[in-house]
């Protein structure tokens, strides 16, 4: 069975500001579950509706450096399953709290999504998932490949 991990900044039905969320919400469901183990990871934004947040399942947490001269930061990993797809959420109150997933502060956005990218890669051994394919969606998600 091949494994795919979609990495995105937003995904329907959890959070949507544009077309990326629609694609990320629809595409993973279309894979034949007999041949593909498809999972999605997005940030755990505080603005995700409570109807979903209340059903997120705690998986694990760890602390991670987000750069030199910076204290290690908390990374929580939550999970939710729907329509045969497993969704993971990267939790960090410093970066993902607010009324919207994005801000107008470019420096903060760069730091936030650099942190997210590193957290995604760091969580993989902890959830025992080694993807064969990692499609990254959007310019600020620049996982090293």
Residue ranges and their predicted role:
Residues 30-34, 123-126, 142:
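Active-site catalytic microenvironments for nucleophilic, acid-base chemistry
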Residues 139-145:
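Conserved small/polar residues in nucleotide/adenosyl-binding loops
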Residues 132:
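Conserved acidic residues
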